[in-house]
Amino acid sequence: MRSSCVLLTALVALAAYYVYIPLPGSVSDPWKLMLLDATFRGAQQVSNLIHYLGLSHHLLALNFIIVSFGKKSAWSSAQVKVTDTDFDGVEVRVFEGPPKPEEPLKRSVVYIHGGGWALASAKIRYYDELCTAMAEELNAVIVSIEYRLVPKVYFPEQIHDVVRATKYFLKPEVLQKYMVDPGRICISGDSAGGNLAAALGQQFTQDASLKNKLKLQALIYPVLQALDFNTPSYQQNVNTPILPRYVMVKYWVDYFKGNYDFVQAMIVNNHTSLDVEEAAAVRARLNWTSLLPASFTKNYKPVVQTTGNARIVQELPQLLDARSAPLIADQAVLQLLPKTYILTCEHDVLRDDGIMYAKRLESAGVEVTLDHFEDGFHGCMIFTSWPTNFSVGIRTRNSYIKWLDQNL
């Protein structure tokens, strides 16, 4: 009996050691976040083992775990009709909210899920619940795009998928089929989905063939650049769940089908050192010392290397492509963008990407709403139902939907 108690105590201690990580006191539901992070880390470690054994690519294994535990079939309710279909060969899940008697045509949001261009799905519970809530509360049609993921495809194929599906949806006959007002359409996405939404928004402003334009764009903690991994938010949240800095850098390398040997050099900004001539032209477009308010820069110092590794940018020219890094787009492109909503979280390495983009858009004359949550963490908006229900998740979702309701 005594030995059993000792063993149980040891196991509990080991579990607590694995789960516990130091978190800022201001983050929402810290113990719940620790448990969520421990679960995700455990899944990552299992997928890495599978990769090491040669059984599958680690991202395929990890996404199999995520989708297996969270996939939801297209289930319609009394209020929202849900169907799986494809738009020009790209899978989508369509949520049709209830019509308003006084409005024969509905508004619409094209939504792009996050997951580092490699994980998640439009068909998992978290995104299904978000899009169902949007469709019902906005009396809208929500198109959630099931774009292809790394490692099956790499940049820029994810962009091609979302552009192809959205262009198909914008056809007059398709909008008519879903009873959508062509003047009330928004593009939106979270994290890597926010990146794709921003890239699509920029591309559509330059596409003269499009008869129907987007009214709004709404970007949720978007990832917008891979040239400076030492912004104040990257420094402040270097190990903050659920997106530590090294994980974000690896997502970028995976997206570009790059070499993992580059990761450590990129973490210290060796890929954009002063001797890398290719990066010089865009350096000012992400100069956080001028783009961020003093309340965010605090006492952090820029990390600018004098000499670095020019080979990285030469082998990964995608780093300097505005389709992957919308933050570095020309001002002439930015000034054509529609009214914009950007949601950022304090405890997120990507916080400053969103804030800098908001500043650049405002400087280009675009009307921007920057919605910042002091207790938010990366990914929080999709965590709204038990057992992963967070207070800040519910508040961010409500704030996002409220803005859409008032502006779309």
From Swiss-Prot:
<dbReference type="InterPro" id="IPR033140">
    <property type="entry name" value="Lipase_GDXG_put_SER_AS"/>
</dbReference>
<feature type="glycosylation site" description="N-linked (GlcNAc...) asparagine">
    <location>
        <position position="389"/>
    </location>
</feature>
<dbReference type="GO" id="GO:0047378">
    <property type="term" value="F:acetylalkylglycerol acetylhydrolase activity"/>
</dbReference>
<dbReference type="GO" id="GO:0006805">
    <property type="term" value="P:xenobiotic metabolic process"/>
</dbReference>
<feature type="glycosylation site" description="N-linked (GlcNAc...) asparagine">
    <location>
        <position position="270"/>
    </location>
</feature>
<keyword id="KW-0812">Transmembrane</keyword>
<dbReference type="GO" id="GO:0005789">
    <property type="term" value="C:endoplasmic reticulum membrane"/>
</dbReference>
<dbReference type="GO" id="GO:0017171">
    <property type="term" value="F:serine hydrolase activity"/>
</dbReference>
<keyword id="KW-0442">Lipid degradation</keyword>
<feature type="topological domain" description="Cytoplasmic">
    <location>
        <begin position="1"/>
        <end position="4"/>
    </location>
</feature>
<feature type="transmembrane region" description="Helical; Signal-anchor for type II membrane protein">
    <location>
        <begin position="5"/>
        <end position="25"/>
    </location>
</feature>
<feature type="topological domain" description="Lumenal">
    <location>
        <begin position="26"/>
        <end position="408"/>
    </location>
</feature>
<keyword id="KW-0325">Glycoprotein</keyword>
<keyword id="KW-0735">Signal-anchor</keyword>
<keyword id="KW-1003">Cell membrane</keyword>
<keyword id="KW-0443">Lipid metabolism</keyword>
<dbReference type="GO" id="GO:0016042">
    <property type="term" value="P:lipid catabolic process"/>
</dbReference>
<dbReference type="GO" id="GO:0016020">
    <property type="term" value="C:membrane"/>
</dbReference>
<feature type="active site">
    <location>
        <position position="348"/>
    </location>
</feature>
<dbReference type="InterPro" id="IPR050300">
    <property type="entry name" value="GDXG_lipolytic_enzyme"/>
</dbReference>
<feature type="active site">
    <location>
        <position position="191"/>
    </location>
</feature>
<feature type="glycosylation site" description="N-linked (GlcNAc...) asparagine">
    <location>
        <position position="287"/>
    </location>
</feature>
<dbReference type="GO" id="GO:0046485">
    <property type="term" value="P:ether lipid metabolic process"/>
</dbReference>
<dbReference type="Pfam" id="PF07859">
    <property type="entry name" value="Abhydrolase_3"/>
</dbReference>
<dbReference type="GO" id="GO:0042301">
    <property type="term" value="F:phosphate ion binding"/>
</dbReference>
<dbReference type="GO" id="GO:0034383">
    <property type="term" value="P:low-density lipoprotein particle clearance"/>
</dbReference>
<keyword id="KW-0492">Microsome</keyword>
<dbReference type="InterPro" id="IPR017157">
    <property type="entry name" value="Arylacetamide_deacetylase"/>
</dbReference>
<comment type="similarity">
    <text>Belongs to the 'GDXG' lipolytic enzyme family.</text>
</comment>
<feature type="active site">
    <location>
        <position position="378"/>
    </location>
</feature>
<feature type="short sequence motif" description="Involved in the stabilization of the negatively charged intermediate by the formation of the oxyanion hole">
    <location>
        <begin position="113"/>
        <end position="115"/>
    </location>
</feature>
<dbReference type="GO" id="GO:0005886">
    <property type="term" value="C:plasma membrane"/>
</dbReference>
<keyword id="KW-0256">Endoplasmic reticulum</keyword>
<keyword id="KW-1133">Transmembrane helix</keyword>
<dbReference type="InterPro" id="IPR029058">
    <property type="entry name" value="AB_hydrolase_fold"/>
</dbReference>
<keyword id="KW-0472">Membrane</keyword>
<keyword id="KW-0378">Hydrolase</keyword>
<protein>
    <recommendedName>
        <fullName>Neutral cholesterol ester hydrolase 1</fullName>
        <ecNumber>3.1.1.-</ecNumber>
        <ecNumber>3.1.1.71</ecNumber>
    </recommendedName>
</protein>
<dbReference type="InterPro" id="IPR013094">
    <property type="entry name" value="AB_hydrolase_3"/>
</dbReference>
<comment type="function">
    <text>Hydrolyzes 2-acetyl monoalkylglycerol ether (1-O-alkyl-2-acetyl-sn-glycerol), the penultimate precursor of the pathway for de novo synthesis of platelet-activating factor. May be responsible for the hydrolysis of cholesterol esters (such as cholesteryl (9Z-octadecenoate)) in macrophages. Also involved in organ detoxification by hydrolyzing exogenous organophosphorus compounds. May contribute to cancer pathogenesis by promoting tumor cell migration.</text>
</comment>
<dbReference type="GO" id="GO:0004771">
    <property type="term" value="F:sterol ester esterase activity"/>
</dbReference>
